[in-house]
């Protein structure tokens, strides 16, 4: 979201970090995104930017050699529901919980996000805003 939205407070930081990933200047060699996160991002880009930006974002993802799309299965959705149900004290979105379940299943510890919920859940968020 921050990469595509020019008005996002973290846009410049996100662009710099994305460029570092592209040049191999981070521990990441590829990025993963789930179909649930794509859904959320498309909706937000449509609302905050434009339909054109949202469509462009999806096309870039599909063509990217850097980004791999991972799908939330029924099993992962059930695990996400357990996380969501368990954490009434946090303001995790259900999409956040699907990401947590997916990351746990794939043994992914680091996440490229500015969403503090990931560090609250125990993942390492980069870059630091």
Show which residues each predicted segment covers.
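Active-site neighborhoods of divalent-metal-dependent phosphate/nucleic-acid chemistry enzymes
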Residues: 12, 68-109
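Acidic, PIN/NYN-like endoribonuclease modules and their adjacent C-terminal/linker elements
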Residues: 100, 105-129
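Alpha-helix C-capping/helix-to-loop hinge sites
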Residues: 1-3, 21-24, 44-48, 64-68, ...
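Short acidic, glycine/proline-enriched helix-loop-strand junctions
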Residues: 61-73, 87-89, 118-129
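Short, well-structured N-terminal submotif of metal-dependent ribonuclease cores
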Residues: 1-33, 46-59, 129
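Histidine- and aromatic-rich ligand-binding microenvironments
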Residues: 32-34, 92-93, 115, 127-129
């Amino acid at each position: 979201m921050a990469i595509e939205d020019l008005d996002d407070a973290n846009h410049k930081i996100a662009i710099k970090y994305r460029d570092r990933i592209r040049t191999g200047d981070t521990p990441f060699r590829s990025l993963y995104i789930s179909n649930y996160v794509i859904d959320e991002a498309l909706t937000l880009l449509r609302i905050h930017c434009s339909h054109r930006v949202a469509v462009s974002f999806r096309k870039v993802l599909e063509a990217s050699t850097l980004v791999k799309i991972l799908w939330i299965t029924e099993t992962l959705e059930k695990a996400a529901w357990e996380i969501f149900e368990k954490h009434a004290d946090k303001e995790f979105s259900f999409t956040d919980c699907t990401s947590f379940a997916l990351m746990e299943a794939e043994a992914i510890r680091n996440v490229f996000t500015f969403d503090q919920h990931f560090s609250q859940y125990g993942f390492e968020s980069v870059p630091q805003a």
